[in-house]
């Protein structure tokens, strides 16, 4: 038995992405759920793993997975074509820009996100003014931080990089 953190929804689904005869394990990056919007309003980027030497290893960024990542991004962009309001929803934009950065298309994507993200949506990154961990912080000590700064830090902390220069500048 292999221990893994719990996954939301239906867990893994399986595809042989690289054509080697072994099924890859696909899931979404649960860290995006509720981070910038409601669960339903969140676009969680695809994660791809393989069973190697008795453990599950993240292979999302391996070159053999690139076509599948492009396919996933195309699906999200098609959804936004059908529902143009998504281009003004923080949860969608956060996942979309993460996908674009992962594919090396972050500069133009960051500019689009910077022009479309909204402050004060009730979701998004916060700091605790009393210095406690967020989960232990009294509600009156929670203060929102600017959404773009929070998004840039979130992406960097969770391995979505390298960030575009404009986003990287916000993490200092």
Language model feature labels by segment:
Residues 1-3, 58:
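Feature marking well-ordered beta-strand scaffolds used for ligand recognition
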Residues 28-172:
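Acidic, small-residue rich beta-repeat scaffolds with periodic aromatic anchors
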